[in-house]
Amino acid sequence: MTFKKDQLTVHIFETRTQMGLAAAEDIAACMKKLLSEKDTINMCFAAAPSQNDVLESLLSMPLPWECVNAFHMDEYVGLKKEDKQSFGYYLDEHIFKKVPFKAVYYVADYGLDYAKCLEENPFDIMCLGIGENGHIAFNDPGVADFSDPLRIKLAKLDDVCRMQQVHDGCFPTFDDVPEYAYTLTVPQMVSAKYMFCVVPAATKADAVYNTLNLDVTDQCPATILRTHENAFLYCDADSAAKLPKEV
């Protein structure tokens, strides 16, 4: 099923596999379109188990990765990109070291100086997810600012966000999850020309419902997707379970 909510296009699939493949096919088509117009594109990736399906599908496709600069949207303070619980490590394992990117820019290598890399390389494609609390990157409710003047900032993670990392199997207990992270800001994220948001699993059903039904405010940061003219949301049956069966 496909429908529009404000400017956001929503696709719902029965399975995660179908969802991931469809998102990957759309991302691949977008990459090829952009590379027909210029020599290099800039892509930003999310690091979370919710992205496994789409990344796996992208890896199965013959794409011109050598024309792509890769970025990611957040990183825990105090972790190096080689640390197994870092987002840099996740992305190395799932895409960054699997294909020949032109360049890969890690948040852990720059900290807040990542802003200069972002300024010099405007995003063409943003591949993201939505957190259980409606966050995008680590822009949690209370941290997100739709008018943020910064490109990247230091964020204190809320309890729901930290508990999600346990639910995702990234950390054994709540207390093991770092309290602080670097995150791209909301304006930096929505500056991308195209946004492909992949959100599977029953744990995200409330977040998907809220994204599509609450007012567009920073109390549910993902609602900002509804204001972007080239934003696409991909759900499976579980994450879409609280939506009407017909729209």
Predicted segments, located by residue:
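N-terminal glycine-/serine-/threonine-rich phosphate-binding loop
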Residues: 1-43
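Ligand-binding beta-strand-loop-alpha-helix segment within the catalytic cores
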Residues: 2-7, 65-127
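Glycine-rich N-terminal segment of FAD-binding domains in flavoprotein oxidoreductases
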Residues: 32-61
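Glycine-rich beta-strand-to-loop/alpha-helix junction loops that act as flexible
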Residues: 45-50, 128-132, 200
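Short, flexible loop segments at the rims of nucleotide/cofactor-binding pockets, characterized by
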Residues: 106, 172-178, 211-213
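Glycine-rich phosphate-binding loop
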Residues: 121-146
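Class I SAM-dependent methyltransferase SAM-binding "motif I" and its flanking Rossmann-like core
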Residues: 137-184
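ATP/nucleoside-binding phosphotransfer catalytic cores, i.e., glycine-rich phosphate-binding loops
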Residues: 184-187, 191-247
